[in-house]
Regions:
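Short glycine/serine-rich loop segments
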Residues: 2-122
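Short helix-loop capping/hinge segments that flank enzyme active sites or metal/cofactor-binding pockets
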Residues: 145-153, 201-213
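Short glycine/threonine-rich loop-to-helix capping motif typified by GTGT followed
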Residues: 165, 194-204
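Acyltransferase
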Residues: 2, 163-189, 210-213
Length: 213
């Protein structure tokens, strides 16, 4: 980003160690949702999402293991994307091998108010870096499919989705369909087992991050 002419403004708030869907910590305090203080800005990149939503900066950076870019973007009404692992090189100050099983799920990505800015930011971030052997240098855009397809999931075993959530999912499917997408309502298999497995992975990662005596 610096090589492309970006001017860093500052660092924004996040919860301790990340991995939380809210943004609060003892050092900097709580970050509020910019549109309603009674709601969360999401996490763990909640400070960045709130700053972008209020116009403090046009574009920002965060990282995502299980939703830390996507969740705050949703909560604050902005755009983001979790790039495919390896698309954006993971060049960090800490050793990634020390965070356990969650390491292969971690990737950096852009946050912005507009999808067009996400596209521009991702084009700058993406590519191979000598310090990340998992990074790849492949084109961001390829041959477009003849027909776009979307699977609509409105039910998850063991979880009762709020009616408002189901309504928004249906509305999203309607908009896609009106724009030429092939939208099919499906039942995703074994999502309940996915939650169990993900819980184990997160707990293991937390143990790796815990102070050692």
């Amino acid at each position: 980003m610096l090589n492309a002419g970006a001017i860093p403004i500052g660092r924004t708030n996040l919860p301790e160690m990340g991995l939380r869907l809210d943004t609060d910590n003892p050092l900097r305090g709580r970050t509020f949702n910019p549109w309603n203080k009674k709601l969360t800005p999401g996490g763990s990149s909640g400070g960045e999402a709130a700053a972008i939503a209020t116009g403090m900066s046009p574009i920002g950076l965060g990282n995502d293991v299980g939703g830390s870019l996507r969740n705050p973007a949703y909560c604050c009404g902005i755009s983001s994307i979790k790039p495919t692992i390896g698309r954006v090189p993971g060049v960090h100050s800490g050793a990634m091998e020390n965070i356990g099983l969650i390491a292969p799920f971690l990737t950096d990505g852009p946050m912005a108010r507009k999808v067009e800015d996400i596209k521009a930011g991702l084009s700058i971030l993406a590519g191979r870096h000598i310090d990340d052997p998992n990074s790849v240098d492949v084109p961001l855009e390829g041959k477009m499919p003849e027909k776009f397809k979307a699977a609509l999931v409105k039910e998850i075993d063991g979880i009762e989705l709020p009616p408002a959530t189901v309504k928004e999912i249906e509305e999203a499917g309607k908009i896609l369909s009106e724009n030429g997408w092939d939208v099919e309502e499906v039942k995703a298999p074994e999502l309940d087992k996915v939650f169990d497995m993900w819980g184990v992975i997160l707990v293991e990662g937390g143990m790796e991050l815990a102070p050692k005596e």
